[in-house]
């Protein structure tokens, strides 16, 4: 831990900075994998080590102008945690588990490369993709489906998007697209007092945070069963989905090529791999800012209350969560 504490301008300004590193040894994690014949999952053991690094900054200013006193405070911090060791017998390093070098909160997914267009296909009868256009393993894409970037050539060199085997050594075309843990946590405090009145305001927020949310509040007609589609509501803001000019007569040119969402389906919309994969395009912004508290108080002068045997009388009004900027889907 390294710190710096400064007082300046006649102690009106105070600056505190800290940088720290913390090592955690023997974290609980799934231990050595057991043979399949055992019929049980690996027991948790003290098999993982983690290193956390971060910093904190706090700046405070207080002064007075005549009988008016005021104060301003600001704090900012950030940190990350990384797995430095994980003892198990699985050389494959599953992305769903700890692995050395992993940063906690990693979100793995695919990088979107727009939508498939009718020009990506040889014709509209066979729906065969042209040479050089990446296909999707297990899926027959159509115009309006999400297209993904081929980040890694597979062993067959088929220019095909796949998930590999879900390990660090073979993640397919997945990569780290975000992090679910908050970064750049900040707070602001404002205060002032004058002739018995005292005002305090507290604000806080997170500068950066990613979230993957998949439900019918985020995606149009997102369903889990074909039989449920007629019961699915279409919420406000979800109508900007890809549309063809006239699919019934074979015109699959996009009416809105810059649509936010891919084409709709008459069956489960994860067909075509549109919503069944985590993608950078649809990560939600979970950063926020809120005015957490506003408190106004008044202290009655002692000369007014001493006649009734009171030493102090103070009244206040406090409001919680005055303003809030929420999750952006």
Identify the role of each PLM range.
Residues 16-65, 99, 103-111, 116, ...:
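Outer membrane beta-barrel strand-and-loop segments of large Gram-negative receptors
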Residues 19-25, 61-63, 76-82, 194-196, ...:
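Transmembrane beta-strands of outer-membrane beta-barrel pores
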Residues 13-15, 70-72, 188, 194, ...:
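Transmembrane beta-strands of outer-membrane beta-barrel proteins
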Residues 1-37, 70, 77, 81:
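Membrane-embedded beta-barrel scaffold of Gram-negative outer-membrane proteins
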Residues 64-178, 218-221, 227-256:
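Conserved small-residue
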């Amino acid at each position: 831990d390294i710190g710096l504490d400064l007082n300046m301008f006649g102690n009106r300004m105070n600056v505190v900075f800290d940088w720290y590193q913390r090592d955690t040894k023997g974290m609980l994690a799934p231990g050595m994998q057991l043979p399949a014949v055992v019929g049980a999952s690996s027991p948790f053991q003290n098999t993982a080590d983690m290193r956390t690094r971060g910093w904190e900054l706090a700046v405070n200013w207080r002064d007075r102008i005549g009988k008016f006193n005021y104060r301003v405070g600001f704090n900012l911090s950030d940190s990350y945690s990384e797995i430095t060791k994980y003892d198990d017998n699985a050389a494959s390093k599953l992305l769903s588990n700890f692995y050395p070098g992993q940063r906690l909160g990693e979100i793995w997914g695919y990088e979107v490369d727009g939508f498939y267009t009718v020009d990506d296909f040889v014709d509209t009868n066979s729906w065969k993709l042209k040479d050089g256009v990446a296909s999707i393993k297990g899926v027959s894409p159509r115009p309006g489906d999400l297209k993904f970037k081929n980040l890694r050539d597979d062993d067959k060199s088929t220019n095909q998007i796949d998930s590999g085997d879900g390990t660090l050594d073979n993640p397919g075309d997945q990569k780290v697209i975000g992090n679910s843990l908050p970064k750049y946590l900040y707070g602001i405090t404002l205060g002032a007092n004058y002739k018995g009145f005292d005002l305090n305001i507290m604000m806080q927020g997170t500068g950066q945070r990613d979230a993957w949310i998949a439900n019918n509040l985020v995606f149009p007609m997102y369903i889990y069963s074909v039989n449920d589609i007629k019961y699915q509501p279409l919420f406000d803001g979800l109508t900007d989905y890809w549309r063809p000019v006239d699919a019934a007569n074979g015109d699959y040119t996009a009416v809105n090529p810059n649509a936010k969402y891919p084409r709709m389906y008459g069956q489960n919309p994860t067909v075509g791999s549109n919503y069944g994969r985590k993608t950078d395009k649809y990560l939600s912004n979970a950063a926020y800012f809120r005015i957490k508290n506003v408190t106004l108080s008044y202290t009655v002068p002692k000369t007014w209350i001493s006649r009734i045997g009171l030493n102090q009388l103070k009244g206040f009004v406090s409001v919680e969560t005055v303003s809030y900027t929420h999750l952006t889907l």
